């Protein structure tokens, strides 16, 4: 049998199962979505009134949710004044949350003051991973916890793709390598209790449950098809940021980028031996 005949026979066989294959692909794999991070916090059973720091809080959505859902005393920290001002407006009256200017490497809190650090989708922007995780260790109480969500490049991300994407998104190349981050965690004396590889979990969740937020592939196609249309109206820098954001979401879906959730703990006593790696698991 020739190679061409073998290919044709393979396609003939595929035709027999194509409909069944498509039906199976249309069945959900049960993605958990980002709300699963709050489930991780719930599992920690921290008491109401626990002090929680939202590092890189943006406009305050997660900080307010942590305060209202769990009754935590939350301090949201962000380096951007506009975000901090917006976060203060978001917080409802009586909500136990405050916001302040600061960075992951210089948090405006005393040492040993926090029960939990929450940091989602921020540390890819931070070149000084050692400084950030050392600061987390400083601020955490003995036995304090951290929930970190960070996105990394995989071996599927081509050098040319990275050369555009990382500057457009303001990311540090070294921070996009998990080995850099895990070395920083260990150097800081924090323990990795659990490492959760998200893969496409969150992207699938949004596709299934919030489809109106999932136009990234279509938008990327339009941006690439007629760049001058959008550059002329919005400027080259804004064009690059928008294209980068669209590609970021697409790359997360197809495995060129992959997020991880780290559940960390500080030693129970000052001066305890260094950390050891904890367990790894897939999914959200």
Positions of PLM-derived features:
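Conserved Class I S-adenosyl-L-methionine
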Residues: 196-284
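N-terminal, positively charged/glycine-rich alpha-helical extensions of SAM-dependent methyltransferases
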Residues: 1-20
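Short alpha-helix
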Residues: 174-188
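Short, glycine-/aromatic-enriched active-site segment of Class I SAM-dependent methyltransferases
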Residues: 151-172
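Class I SAM-dependent methyltransferase SAM/SAH-binding core
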Residues: 53, 59-106
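A short glycine-rich, Lys/Arg-flanked "PGG" loop and its adjoining helix->strand segment in the class I
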Residues: 130-145
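A conserved beta-strand element that flanks and buttresses the S-adenosyl-L-methionine
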Residues: 118
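Conserved SAM-binding loop and adjacent beta-strand
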Residues: 21-38
């Amino acid at each position: 049998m020739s190679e061409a005949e073998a290919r044709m026979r393979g396609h003939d066989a595929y035709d027999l199962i194509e409909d069944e294959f498509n039906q199976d692909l249309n069945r959900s794999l049960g993605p958990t979505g980002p709300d699963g991070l709050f489930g991780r916090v719930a599992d920690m059973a921290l008491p109401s009134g626990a002090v929680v720091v939202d590092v890189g809080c943006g406009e305050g959505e997660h900080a307010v949710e942590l305060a209202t859902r769990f009754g935590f005393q939350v301090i949201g920290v962000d380096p951007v004044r506009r975000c901090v001002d917006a976060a203060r407006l978001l917080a409802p009256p009586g909500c136990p949350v405050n916001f302040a200017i600061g960075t992951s490497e210089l948090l405006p809190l005393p040492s040993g003051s926090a029960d939990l650090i929450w940091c989602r989708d921020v540390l890819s922007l931070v070149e000084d991973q050692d400084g950030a995780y050392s600061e987390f260790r400083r601020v955490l109480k003995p036995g304090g916890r951290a929930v970190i969500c960070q996105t990394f490049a995989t071996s599927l991300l081509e050098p040319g793709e990275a050369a555009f994407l990382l500057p457009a998104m303001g990311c540090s190349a070294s921070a996009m390598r998990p080995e850099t981050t895990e070395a920083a965690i260990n150097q800081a004396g924090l323990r990795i209790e659990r490492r959760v590889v998200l893969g496409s979990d969150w992207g699938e969740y949004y596709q299934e449950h919030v489809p109106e937020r999932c136009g990234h592939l279509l938008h990327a196609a339009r941006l690439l098809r007629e760049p001058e249309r959008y550059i002329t109206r919005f400027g080259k820098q804004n064009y690059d940021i928008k294209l980068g954001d669209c590609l970021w979401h697409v790359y997360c879906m197809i495995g060129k980028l992959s997020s991880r959730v780290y559940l960390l703990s500080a030693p129970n006593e000052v001066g305890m031996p260094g950390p050891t790696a904890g367990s790894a698991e897939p999914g959200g």
